[in-house]
Regions:
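Acidic, surface-exposed loops and disordered segments
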Residues: 2-442
Length: 442
């Protein structure tokens, strides 16, 4: 789940208002087709003019101060983003494998991990040895992810990133989940033994090269849907243990989109759940530099012009940000979606299934990046189902979700939209490697 911060309290950039009443019934909305690419209208021009007037009214000095403080002119640059630029598939060593894991997809960019590294000669710079993945108990979103499924899947993403990076080095990562007899609820998630192996295949090299280019894309997609052959290629040489199900039929895509809008509004209306997410927003550059995690304006899929405007204008309240998120979901994310993917497992409550689902998700995102597709993780429906279950409230989404997708909610672990992006995705901040890596014995 991602709650964009509103740049001005207006409609999302690159979109026009949805004329459809959000209270339409499922039967009515099932007749809607994904809407085509829109052209700027009078309202879009008025929005841009309003932003310009607001900036002028703020005064040149104030604009400069806020713009500098919020990183308006250096998006995606500086220390919090160095790992993306520095990582290379050709660099050997266990630390490089951990760096790949740190760049993996994870919920809300909470980066819920740290790693114990034990090289065969006693150094973290060794190319063979062991890596222990451990959960950081302080990095959680207890209301957005009440049963911990997304966090656990994030560990699976990190494990798969290590597997891919190891193969690029001609190594093999042998994963032992919950080692030494640990409980599957233990914070000791896995031990990875890195050993010498055959040279990588071209496919393995392709996936590894995508690691530093993989970013979540939250902007609009073009009207051209990915071809089925391209979608099929995303699961080539994919890890076992989970299944990817595509939703591509136009009416089904529209109905899934309606559920996303409904779930997003329900999250926004849930003050505590909304606050749990908003706590991970880094509203200006000083917060990004201090925390090097969480969600930022840079990653909301805004155009360059709108991003600068959003950073110059004062930060919005949580409520205004939620309003913008709902509009973005309705008028950009679902309106331009042509394809959804769902990670299906046997049981979303099973810890091993969660790891396997995360491994598959990371594979698909890397494969999508390699062929130039944008991918946007969208879990509002399953998050809302889990939240209602945790509060013993009526479940309003599961039956409709299963009817549209053919996947029961207890088997729907994660979901996303994928397509041809209209603009480049920007990187999210990452912590210093030294903050997540511990040499053995520390």
């Amino acid at each position: 789940m991602t709650t964009p911060i509103s740049p001005s309290g207006t409609i999302p950039d690159g979109s026009e208002p949805d004329r459809t009443d959000s209270t339409d019934s499922a039967s009515e909305s099932s007749n809607h087709r994904p809407r085509g690419r829109r052209h700027p209208s009078g309202r879009t021009a008025f929005k841009a003019a309003s932003i310009s007037c607001a900036i002028l009214a703020a005064g040149a000095a104030g604009v400069g101060t806020r713009g500098a403080a919020n990183g308006a002119w250096n998006a995606g640059e500086g220390a919090p983003y160095e790992l993306w630029r520095q990582w290379s598939a050709g660099t050997s060593g266990l630390r490089n494998l951990v760096a790949a894991a740190t760049l993996a997809a994870n919920p809300h960019n909470i980066q819920p991990w740290f790693f114990d590294v034990n090289g065969d000669s006693g150094s973290a710079e060794d190319s063979t040895g062991s890596i222990d993945l451990r959960a950081d108990p302080d990095r959680v979103t207890p209301l957005c992810d009440p049963d911990g499924r997304e966090r656990a899947a994030g560990f699976g993403c990190a494990l798969y990133a290590i597997e891919v990076a190891a193969r690029a080095q001609g190594k093999r990562a042998e994963i032992e989940p919950w080692p030494d007899g640990a409980s599957e609820r233990s914070d000791h998630i896995a031990r990875i033994r890195v050993v010498n192996d055959a040279p990588p295949t071209s496919r393995e090299q392709e996936l590894a090269t995508a690691i530093p280019r993989r970013h979540t894309y939250r902007g609009p997609f073009t009207a051209s849907a990915p071809e089925q052959a391209v979608l099929d290629s995303l699961t080539k040489a994919a890890p076992d243990g989970a299944q990817l199900v595509w939703v591509t039929e136009a009416s089904a895509v529209a109905r899934v989109g309606d559920l996303y809008v409904e779930a997003t509004q329900a999250i926004a209306d849930d003050t505590r759940m909304s606050a749990d997410s908003f706590a991970w927003f880094r509203n200006d550059r000083s917060q990004i530099d201090a925390h090097r995690d969480g969600l930022t304006l840079d990653c909301q899929g805004l155009s360059s012009t709108m991003l600068v405007a959003a950073k110059i204008l004062p930060a919005q309240s949580r409520e205004a940000s939620d309003d913008f998120w709902v509009k973005s979901t309705r008028e950009v994310h679902t309106a331009t979606a042509r394809t959804y993917g769902i990670i299906r497992v046997d049981d979303v409550d099973n810890p091993r299934n969660r790891l396997d689902g995360g491994r598959l998700l990371q594979h698909v995102h890397l494969a999508a990046t390699a062929v130039g597709l944008g991918l946007h993780h969208m879990n509002q429906v399953t998050e809302r189902i889990a939240r209602d279950a945790a509060q013993d409230r009526p479940d309003r989404l599961s039956q409709r979700w299963a009817a549209i997708t053919g996947i029961p909610a207890p088997q729907s672990l994660l979901a996303f939209r994928v397509g041809h992006p209209e603009r480049a995705a920007r990187p999210s901040p990452r912590r210093y490697l030294d903050d997540v890596v511990r040499d053995a014995g520390q």
